[in-house]
């Protein structure tokens, strides 16, 4: 999808800017400035939605300046997060977003077990007979699930895991009425636009 106004008055641009991390220390980052068209506001944060061509949206939420990112995350839940996105306002937003990369690795066996996936991790109860059997008669079961995620955000778009998404170009000449610059810790997510499900979510507390 490409949305182009009758006159191009604002282009994406990149400039050096300060970013203040979770401890208040500052570093110089490459800040990407752009104009977006969906403004998010909830009790303790503001943010924006940046659309991508492939049916995904980049979502950013910036907690209030006097609120620690850890406190903000601790009070988040899926219901309020999705409600905030669903209630986005069609408002022009002047945004600033730093280039960043993040990579995490997490063991998921315990998480999946708590979610109810018990038998698969039990060497006696697991049933993977449709996949095959051990020649010595031992049962197949899952001993470890390792989840690795990687995201890179720059002026060319966002690359998450093995999938690359490209921003939708949105241009217009209406007066901007909101301003959201991600110059301190923030929460970000990539959302499947069709069903509203987050496919990637994280927090940038230091760059």
Listing of model-derived features with the role each one plays in the protein:
Residues 6-7, 11-207:
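Hydrophobic-core positions in well-structured secondary-structure elements of globular domains
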């Amino acid at each position: 999808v490409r949305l182009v106004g009758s006159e191009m008055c604002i282009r994406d641009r990149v400039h050096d800017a300060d970013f203040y991390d979770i401890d208040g220390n500052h570093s110089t980052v490459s800040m990407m400035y752009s104009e977006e068209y969906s403004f998010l506001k909830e009790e303790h944060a503001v943010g924006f939605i940046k659309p991508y061509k492939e049916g995904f949206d980049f979502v950013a939420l910036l907690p209030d300046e006097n609120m620690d990112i850890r406190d903000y995350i601790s009070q988040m839940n899926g219901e309020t997060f999705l409600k905030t996105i669903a209630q986005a306002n069609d408002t022009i937003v002047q945004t600033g977003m730093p280039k960043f990369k993040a990579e995490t690795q997490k063991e998921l066996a315990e998480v999946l077990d708590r979610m109810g996936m018990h038998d698969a991790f039990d060497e006696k109860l697991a049933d993977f007979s449709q996949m095959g059997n051990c020649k010595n008669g031992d049962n197949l079961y899952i001993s470890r699930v390792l989840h690795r995620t990687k995201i890179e955000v720059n002026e060319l778009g966002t690359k998450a895991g093995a999938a690359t998404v490209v921003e939708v170009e949105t241009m217009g000449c209406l007066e901007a009425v909101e301003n959201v610059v991600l110059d301190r810790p923030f929460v970000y997510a990539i959302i499947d636009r069709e069903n509203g499900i987050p496919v990637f979510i994280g927090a940038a507390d230091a760059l």
